[in-house]
Amino acid sequence: MSNKKDITVKMSGGKKIREAREKVKPDTLYNLTNAVEQLKSASYVKFDPTLEIVMKLGIDPRHSDQMVRGVVNLPAGTGKIVRVAVICKEEREEEAKSAGADLVGSTNIIDEIKSGKINFDVCIATPDMMAAIGSVARILGPKGLMPNPKLGTVTLDIKNAIKNAKSGQVEYRAEKSGIIHAGLGKLSFSDQDLLKNLNAFIEAVIKAKPSGLKGSYLKAMYLSSTMGASVQIDLTSIA
């Protein structure tokens, strides 16, 4: 038998969702400032949602010269606790630990990865370990965890790499459909901090435009929050 109180709570929750979504006009184009304000006012979840961006690019990633990929250091961070693994030779393990790495080792970490144990968000490696790491490339690659010199995760500068990963470094990569998706901070951040992150990310993606690309590069852009509304950005408002 249904509890009347439970039914009332469900109806109340549904009403809140409807009211929140009604605050966002689906046919309206927003600039970044107004978009952030609208998403905050339309959020109804009880946890701290992530501000997410989706960018549709006029590229074909199947062509090697149209790959768009890189990393961005977000000025205000991501709001997430990032677990960092460092794979290096024994003589550099203490340096990695002192720099704040959560997991440090060499072949022992590689063996854990082979067994399916992956308890880190970022994997950093020194160049002399890459041959050994190649044995788990098929595991780490699809998860976006394979160390890559272009992303700063294959490096001799362990300390700085850990600092970047911990402070809010976000990787982006265009999917087969030409779409880039990333989380750029928590909705509880100040509007100013969210806008700093947004501008830094958008600027980086625009700078990554393939030199030989013909036609329009940035096709569409949307902002949303976790389990929340989505708004379309007016591309003419992007400097």
UniProtKB/Swiss-Prot annotation:
PROSITE patterns: RIBOSOMAL_L1. NCBIfam families: rplA_bact. InterPro entries: Ribosom_uL1_bac-type, Ribosomal_uL1, Ribosomal_uL1-like, Ribosomal_uL1/biogenesis, Ribosomal_uL1_3-a/b-sand, Ribosomal_uL1_CS. GO terms for biological process: regulation of translation; translation. GO terms for molecular function: rRNA binding; structural constituent of ribosome; tRNA binding. One of its GO terms (cellular component) is large ribosomal subunit. Belongs to the universal ribosomal protein uL1 family. Pfam families: Ribosomal_L1 (PF00687). Binds directly to 23S rRNA. The L1 stalk is quite mobile in the ribosome, and is involved in E site tRNA release. Protein L1 is also a translational repressor protein, it controls the translation of the L11 operon by binding to its mRNA. Transmembrane segments: none annotated. Part of the 50S ribosomal subunit. This is Large ribosomal subunit protein uL1. The keyword Phosphoprotein does not apply. Keywords: Repressor, Ribonucleoprotein, Ribosomal protein, RNA-binding, rRNA-binding, Translation regulation, tRNA-binding.
